[in-house]
Amino acid sequence: MALITLRQLLDHAAERLQGYGVPAFNINNMEQGLAILAAARACDAPVIASRGARSYAGDIMLRHIVEALAEMYPQIPICLHQDHGNNEATCLSAIRHGFTSVMMDGSLQADMKTVASYDYNVDITRRVTDAAHWVGASVEGELGVLGSLEKGEAEAEDGSGAEGKLDHSQMLTDPDQAVEFVQATRVDALAIAMGTSHGAYKFSRKPDGEILAMRVIEEIHARLPATHLVMHGSSSVAARLQDLINAHGADMPQTYGVPVEEIERGIRHGVRKVNIDTDCRMALTGQFRKVAMESPKEFDARKFMIPAMKEMEALVRDRFERFGTAGNASKITVIPMDDMAKRYASGALDPAVATAKAA
């Protein structure tokens, strides 16, 4: 099956009777890709394969990995997505190398450390959207700065993360401004800032509404019911994986992630894409450490990789099933990017805004 755009995939997710979410898993190497696609085939789920660490595996390598996966698993629609693009050149380079979707993160300036103004965000995101839509590619934007409401700080990940102290006005997406932003930029999906952050150390306690503001998602969905919302930094950081890692030589402090139940709540209110990376890293690392400690004479990297891939496959399948993604791959007929470009040009995919009902 051909690669699919993010817009078509998330439209399909929103059009189902109950709606479903699609986890976006970072792919940095072959083993992660094989684990994700094995899980997808087992439960008939479409896939968003996201490139996060650009310096680790560049556009060309990842494109060929995903092309190979698409050939091996022709029954699975795969969206090849670039995460946290820092400027137009990064986004357009990804599209030129075969990515069907890009994220323009204009919440930060090009250094990915300095908080950007709203006008800067609108301007650069709109420019990327205009260019991407000409060729049928999808664009995700971000409004508000990802980070911990507890600490007032962002967690740097793969070179991306605001520096310095932040206040809640910066770290919570304003629902009214979200409407303006979507109308001005015509993004296909909108990443929301509501207390999640990158990395493992998201919360010092089980999150509640004070530090994980799910109400923001609900308020934005009420105003933008047709806009696909995105939760970043949504690994659950399961205690089981923390314990597995620490039982085999690590010293990982206790931490809390985003409960899967809260993600399911978000899906009921318009969240269609859910970014998950730390959970996959932990699944892999736990098994690496287990093999290293239990078989100290082992030197064959494959003996480390195989159980690690199985652990990650189980985690990925669980998310496909919990988010309602399972069972939908075979229901999707991919629309070519040229046809998506025509739909953008016609205005058929312009954003819709909820109108207030008369009293």
Curated annotation (Swiss-Prot):
Cofactor binding: number and manner: Binds 2 Zn(2+) ions per subunit. One is catalytic and the other provides a structural contribution.
Gene3D superfamilies reported in the protein's UniProt record: Aldolase class I
Recorded GO MF terms: fructose-bisphosphate aldolase activity; zinc ion binding
Amino acids binding Zn(2+) 1: 84, 198, 232
EC number(s) per entry: 4.1.2.13
Catalytic activity: beta-D-fructose 1,6-bisphosphate = D-glyceraldehyde 3-phosphate + dihydroxyacetone phosphate
Keyword Metal-binding on entry: yes
Pfam families according to UniProt: F_bP_aldolase (PF01116)
Record bears the keyword Lyase: yes
EC category: lyase
Pathway(s) of this molecule: Carbohydrate biosynthesis; Calvin cycle; Carbohydrate degradation; glycolysis; D-glyceraldehyde 3-phosphate and glycerone phosphate from D-glucose: step 4/4
CDD domains named among the record's database cross-references: TBP_aldolase_IIB
One of the protein's GO biological processes: reductive pentose-phosphate cycle
Catalytic residues (UniProt): 83 (proton donor)
Ranges that cross the membrane: none
Residues annotated to bind Zn(2+) 2: 105, 142
Keywords on record: Calvin cycle, Glycolysis, Lyase, Metal-binding, Zinc
Subunit structure: Homodimer.
Misc. remarks from the entry: This protein is encoded within the form I ribulose-bisphosphate carboxylase operon, which predominates when carbon dioxide is limiting.
Family affiliation: Belongs to the class II fructose-bisphosphate aldolase family.
The name this protein goes by in its record: Fructose-bisphosphate aldolase 1
Gene: cfxA
